[in-house]
A protein has these predicted regions:
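Enzymes and membrane/adaptor proteins characterized by extended Gly/Ser/Thr/Asp/Glu-rich
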Residues: 54-174, 201-213, 239-252, 277-323
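Aromatic-lined glycan-binding groove of carbohydrate-active enzymes
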Residues: 191, 221-236, 241
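Structured alpha-helical segments in the cores of large, soluble enzyme domains
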Residues: 48-52, 182-185, 221-229, 258-266
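Preference for extracellular/luminal or secreted protein segments
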Residues: 19-51, 265-266, 285-335
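Alpha-helix-loop-beta-strand connector modules within alpha/beta enzyme cores
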Residues: 81-90, 169-189, 252-273
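Sec-dependent N-terminal signal peptides
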Residues: 4-14
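Short, well-ordered coil/turn segments that N-cap beta-strands
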Residues: 28-30, 57-59, 86-90, 142-143, ...
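A general structural motif
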Residues: 38-45, 216-227, 252-259, 283-288
């Protein structure tokens, strides 16, 4: 079983704390990111999230469309969160196009999709566009973006190509536009996330709703190889994808063959591995506890949940206890 990389978690999510001073529960909580309802402190759900943030019951929050109306509102919301938890990660899905939380004009938006950018803009213009996007996110207080998508554009894909989320069908073109995206965000001090490893483009299904099978290809891996070799890859999001011929029993999110053998050992990625939303249908029908343990033992670092509660229980509390129990039962080993 894979040992916890607690030093990594503390370094990323709890900078400034002495490792000896951080309890097991505190360390485990930093492995969890949650979504929440509400867009201001007037909302009860938002206040509940703020309370938990103050007690550091999770390492980060993810912002969805339900949390964003305009720039003034978003700044105020994030200010309230950071007053409770100054070192928390504030993440957003801002790809542009269909997957955008910054459609309001106050964000200098809306921003075009990845496919539109790569089809109409040269690299310099793309960099300038993504710089504007990054500046707007930074001004609001966001420090992590779940983008860029580095999947390949395949016309048969209902979730990637149909929504124009990929830059191109050509891996070399994906690489140069993804580099422009990552470089623009790095300049503003915002972390980026390559997704959806090992490549969602060939899937004929939407992993939000159904089991999604993909065929692994050298081209699909090229954007990851390039970003890892150049040092641009900071965080990689693993998709709920069943990879034919490698692990047809587990989605990539729960697969040691994909995360440890392929991503860690073969591609030499030493950064942070985050799951796609663990509440998506594509992750399978196993019990939540089994999924959580499998993800960690497969080599994953951070668990992402889009909802603040699961069956009326706070997600962070539930998942933290699952992990602690697994450690105590030696289902997960601890360094």
């Amino acid at each position: 079983m894979r040992a916890f990389k607690f030093i990594l978690f503390v370094a990323i999510f709890a900078m400034g704390l002495n490792g000896a001073e951080v309890s097991l529960r505190a360390k485990v909580s930093q492995m969890i990111m949650v979504g929440f309802n509400g867009a201001s402190t007037k909302d009860a759900a938002f206040r509940a999230m703020l309370s938990d943030a103050g007690y550091e019951r999770f390492g980060g929050v993810m912002l969805l469309g339900r949390n964003v109306t305009n720039k003034t509102q978003l700044k105020a919301s994030i200010k309230a969160i950071k007053e409770k938890s100054p070192k928390i990660f504030i993440a957003i899905d801002e790809e542009g196009g269909n997957v955008s939380r910054m459609k309001d004009k106050s964000f200098d938006g809306p921003y075009p999709s990845a496919y539109e950018v790569a089809s109409t803009l040269d690299i310099k213009s793309a960099y300038d566009l993504y710089s504007k996007m990054a500046i707007n996110l930074k001004e609001c207080g966001i420090n992590l973006n779940f983008a860029p998508v580095v999947d390949l554009h395949d016309e048969n894909s209902p979730i990637i190509a149909a929504k124009q989320r990929a830059f191109s069908e050509y891996a070399s073109k994906v690489v140069i536009y993804a580099d422009a995206f990552m470089d623009a965000f790095k300049e503003q001090g915002i972390l980026t996330t390559l997704k959806h490893f090992p490549g969602h483009g060939s899937s004929k299904e939407d992993s939000h709703k159904n089991k999604s099978e993909v065929t692994l290809s050298k081209d699909a891996l090229l954007p990851y190889k390039d970003a890892i070799s150049t040092g641009r890859a900071q965080i990689i999001m693993v998709g709920h994808l069943f990879v034919k011929g490698i692990d047809e029993d587990n989605p990539a999110t729960l697969s040691k063959k994909i995360i440890t053998d392929l991503l860690r050992n073969e591609l030499k990625f030493n950064g942070v591995v985050i799951s796609d939303d663990m509440l998506m249908k594509g992750v399978g029908d196993e019990a939540l506890a089994q999924k959580v343990v499998k993800f960690i033992n497969a080599g994953g670092d951070i668990l992402l949940f889009s909802e603040f509660k699961i069956n009326n229980q706070r997600t962070a509390d539930l998942v933290t206890q699952i992990i602690i129990d697994a450690v105590n039962e030696k289902k997960i080993s601890k360094e």
